[in-house]
Structure formats: C-alpha cells, structure tokens
Design a protein with these regions (language model features):
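Transmembrane alpha-helices and adjacent helix-loop boundaries
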Residues: 2-370
Length: 370
C-alpha cells in the first residue's frame, strides 16, 4: 500500500520542470496566430512570399537597376529609378512656384510648424500656453511666407505652392478648427434648445457633404454673393472652408469625449461651487480632450491627405507640384513613377508618424497617465 511518504519521495525524485523563459513565451504568443493552424500557416507563408517579391522588386528598381548619373537621356534607356530626376526637380516638387531664392523662408516656416507640432505632442505641455505658442507660430510663419516687412520681399498667395501650402492649409485649418470644434461640441451638448439645434444643423450639414463641395462653393459661389468691387483671396477662401469642415469633425470627436465623462464629475463640480464655464474649463474639458485625442489625431491625418483636393479650385498643392514637374518637356515620359513615389513616401511618413503617436496616447491613457 502506497503511503503519503512514498508519494512525497517519488515527487522529489522526479526532475523539476523548468518554466519557459519570457522570450519563449513571447515567441510562442507571436507565432501562434500566424502558424497555429494549417490555414493560418498557408496564409502567412503566402503573405511573406508576396512581401518578398515586392521588396525584391523595390530594391531592384531603387538600387540595382537605378540610374544614378547622367541626365534625362541616361534615364530614358534605363530600367530603374531615375535619381537625376530628383536632383533636377526635388526643390520644385517641394516648394512649387515660390521664388527660388526665397525657399529658405518657407523652409524656416515649416520648421516653425514642425516645432510647434512637436511641442504639442508632449503631454506635459498640454496647457493654455499652447494657444500662445500656436498664435506666435502662425504669425511668424505668415510673416516669413508672405513677406513685405522686415526687409522681406512680398510674395503673393498665388505663388504659395507645394508641400508648404499643403502643410499650411492642414496646420492652420486644424489650429483654428479645434477651438471652433470645441465650442460646437459644447453647444451641441447644451441644455438650451436653440443653441443645441443650431449646432446640430451646422455639424450635420457640414459632415453630410464632401470637402470638395465646400471648397467649390467657397471658390466659385461665395464671390457671387460678395458686394461689387470686394474680393476675397482664393487661398483665404479655401482656408476658411477647411477650418469649417475640420471644426465639424473635431466637434463630434470632442462630443464623444464629453459623453464619456461620468455624470458625477458634473455634480462634484457643482458641489464645489463652480459655475458651468468653470466646471467645463477646469474639470470636464481636460478629461474629455484626453479621451478624444486618438480620434483627433486620426482627423489630423485625414485632413493632411485631403489638402490634395484644393487642386480642384486652382491651388498648387504638393501633389499638384509633383504632377507639374512631370510635364517638363525634358522629362515627359521618362520619370513617371519617381514623383508619385516621392509623394507617397512623404504622406506615408507623416501618416505613420501620427498613427504611431495615436497608439502611444492610447497606451498612455490605458495606464492612467496624465
């Protein structure tokens, strides 16, 4: 008869089973969805094969078969990427028809915008000083690009083009659209029927039509209603249309954040003696905006890409300058993919960077960090 002592001794004699290491557990967790079943394994291998073919073709086009020296004639007989095309047309694709000798001004303005965006992305700087920062950035960029003061030559808006124009339209549109969107979100959540109905109608009408329609109306229809002799700059009309369109979408994102705030926060604010605007400014809005940041980042990505629509009203945005560069008689039919590849890389870098930032914010909020 087996006793408890015999069982204990047999367990001591058994070799101890080693716990799998963290690396092995992580590897198993990663590979199981990919190769856990025969179907998953086949799909994974097929995708890897397609990626290998795409990477091999891209490497061959960019490196192995690329033309690195010579001009248009050398690229004409080549079968790969035409790097001399970038050397000849890169500045035009970026800056468009902006005066060549003044490119440093728009480059500096873009650096100002990128610096403001970088500071805005740091959570510890999320305070009212951001309003001052963006006001100074927009004024400084306008002085640099427009000129006419401090010894800078005046450059009309008809010569604003390329990547700086796309960047300006999206950055200014979001900078002015954000406070307007917050006001619309608060108005839509208001208990006053008249204000709530006006906000609802405005938001739903703007969100119910495509951006291209609003741009067309701002460019073509609006001048018809202006008094005789009064004209509004085409770029300004497009910018106002983008601000209005952005505000409607931002309002819905902020309203979602407001609805996620527990009712107890409002009641606690009232118990502390705070009136409506104090409660919103000090208690409710800071929490709602943190919740709404990921969708707001997605809206920013979409609006940067949607700036390509301004070409329909005659503005020379980044994608338009890329296309225009291809019409140079010296390069027609020679460099076809190079311009679009460059534009795709620029949009991809921006979109991926903003998407990664959105995921970072989501992880931060899950951890409950401020």
């Amino acid at each position: 008869m087996t006793t408890a002592t015999d069982i204990a001794e047999s367990q001591l004699k058994m070799p101890a089973q080693r716990e799998p290491s963290v690396e092995r557990r992580l590897l198993h967790r990663t590979l199981k969805p990919l190769f856990g079943t025969p179907v998953n394994a086949i799909v994974t291998l097929a995708c890897l094969w397609i990626l290998w073919l795409a990477a091999k073709g891209a490497y061959g086009w960019l490196v192995t078969r690329a033309v690195t020296e010579g001009g248009a004639q050398a690229c004409k007989v080549g079968h790969g990427a035409c790097w001399p095309y970038y050397e000849a047309k890169l500045r035009f694709m970026i800056f468009g028809v902006y005066p060549y000798d003044e490119h440093w001004r728009v480059a500096l303005a873009m650096i100002l915008f990128l610096g403001a965006i970088g500071i805005t992305m740091i959570p510890r700087f999320w305070n009212r000083n951001l309003l001052v920062l963006w006001s100074m950035t927009i004024v400084g960029a306008a002085i640099l690009i427009w000129g006419g003061v401090f010894g800078l030559s005046y450059v009309p808006t008809t010569q604003w083009s390329g990547l700086p124009l796309s960047f300006l339209l999206s950055a200014v549109g979001l900078a002015f659209g954000f406070p307007l969107g917050v006001i619309l979100a608060l108005a839509r959540s208001s208990k006053l029927p008249a204000i709530r109905v006006i906000a609802i109608v405005f938001i739903e009408v703007i969100r119910g039509v495509p951006l291209i329609s609003i741009l067309f109306m701002a460019s073509v229809m609006l001048p018809l209603f202006m008094p005789s002799g009064i004209t509004v700059d085409k770029l300004l009309r497009a910018q106002i249309a983008i601000v209005i369109f952005a505000a409607a979408y931002i309002a819905e994102a902020v309203r979602g954040g407001l609805q996620a705030i527990p009712r107890g926060q409002h009641e606690a604010s009232s118990a502390m003696g705070l009136h409506y605007w104090q409660a919103m400014r000090l208690v409710v809005l800071p929490q709602a905006l943190k919740i709404a940041i990921p969708p707001l980042v997605n809206i920013s990505i979409g609006f940067f890409q949607d700036t390509t629509l301004v070409t329909i009203i005659g503005l020379l945005d980044f994608l338009s300058t890329v296309r225009t560069a291809m019409t140079d008689p010296n390069w027609v039919g020679i460099a076809v993919m190079e311009g679009y590849v460059f534009a795709a890389v620029v949009f991809l870098v921006f979109s991926y960077g903003m998407g990664a930032y959105s995921r970072f914010l989501e992880r931060r909020m899950r951890l409950g960090l401020d």
